[in-house]
Amino acid sequence: MLASLFPLARPVLHALDAETAHRLTIRALSLLPAGAPPADDPRLAVSVLGRHFPNPVGLAAGFDKGAEVPDALLSLGFGFVEVGGVVPRPQPGNPRPRVFRLTGDRAVINRFGLNSEGLAVVAARLAARAGRPGILGVNIGANKDATDRLADYVACTRALAGLVDFVTVNVSSPNTPGLRDLQGEVFLDDLLARVVAARDEAASPRRAAILLKIAPDITLDSLDAITATALRRGVEGLVISNTTVARPASLTETTLAAEAGGLSGRPLFAPSTRLLAEAFLRVGDRLPLVGVGGVDSAEAAWTKIRAGASLVQLYSALVYAGPGLVREIKAGLVERIAREGVPLAALVGRDAAALARME
């Protein structure tokens, strides 16, 4: 239903500022009955992270920050949904305006600053949907004014790990000062050790997988250290990548491109895919990868998979293409799987060496 309405709603939504339009979308989703998602072609199924995903196409964190409408989003056909980011105490984030559409570039810049209703509110919403079907994850961070950021991640993990299928440790948001410093080897080692321990202490049979979300703007030496630390500390997967602080010369919306914040959408595709491929070359099948950044078509999702992604996520593309994009991507993946004549899992990372050098 939403997919058919989007062409009519898009001019209205895009006439509004981006954040207001997004709140209206969340409101609309909350009013619609969350029906069962459409049945997926079995060739799209993925078994990873200790779960059986009906398809590999997920919704990235940031769309449903407060876990208000996860079931409505799953009903759109996503194989999984990641809510958040969540921080322990409510915080307003950065002043508005803080999100900008670069329409000519099919991109978005945001500097939300991890605005969140706080851990208690999100945990209550997730607890209220216990027992419902669908694979759900949560993205966690630290309060901007936290005196002990590691403790913030531990608190979020303890409260949420028994309510979701995976917890994504976000140390890569460019909009919280100093947060990306936690990607440094010493900090990261301590952080992951404590988060994994907190997950293991959670008295829940669900045992959420722990994922780590990293920035696209790191060096290969940093990637070496991050992947080694993740493997050593028992992290179950990497999410590659968050938004970029870089501004490619190809951007046409030059005035908006000067806005501070993280850039997502189509311009992020190449750098995030290169990093994804480099990560796969380092970890192989020892650590599942989630490919994020510029996934706006079946071909883009297919490329992420060949670069090493077992799962993919999208968000910014929905701003321009609407929810019907999910169905289009899945149909395109089925066509490509049929053409190749091999299971989807056999295609993961097949072209990583070449895609690590993509322009």
From Swiss-Prot:
Residues annotated to bind FMN: 61-65, 85, 139, 170, 213, 241, 265, 294, 315-316
Pathway the protein takes part in: Pyrimidine metabolism; UMP biosynthesis via de novo pathway; orotate from (S)-dihydroorotate (quinone route): step 1/1
Membrane topology of the entry: Peripheral membrane protein
Cellular compartment(s): Cell membrane
Cofactor: FMN
InterPro entries xrefs: Aldolase_TIM, DHO_dehydrogenase, Dihydroorotate_DH_2, Dihydroorotate_DH_cat, Dihydroorotate_DH_CS
Claim: Cytoplasm is one of the keywords in the record: no
Binding locations of substrate: 65, 110-114, 170, 175, 242-243
MF annotations from Gene Ontology: dihydroorotate dehydrogenase (quinone) activity
Cofactor binding remark: Binds 1 FMN per subunit.
Keyword Membrane: yes
Keywords per UniProt: Cell membrane, Flavoprotein, FMN, Membrane, Oxidoreductase, Pyrimidine biosynthesis
Entry EC no(s): 1.3.5.2
Gene Ontology biological-process entries: 'de novo' pyrimidine nucleobase biosynthetic process; 'de novo' UMP biosynthetic process
Reactions listed under catalytic activity: (S)-dihydroorotate + a quinone = orotate + a quinol
Family matches, as Pfam families: DHO_dh
GO cellular component: cytoplasm; plasma membrane
Catalytic-site annotation from UniProt: 173 (nucleophile)
Cited function: Catalyzes the conversion of dihydroorotate to orotate with quinone as electron acceptor.
Subunit structure: Monomer.
Family recorded in the similarity comment: Belongs to the dihydroorotate dehydrogenase family. Type 2 subfamily.
Stated name of the protein: Dihydroorotate dehydrogenase (quinone)
Gene name for this UniProt entry: pyrD
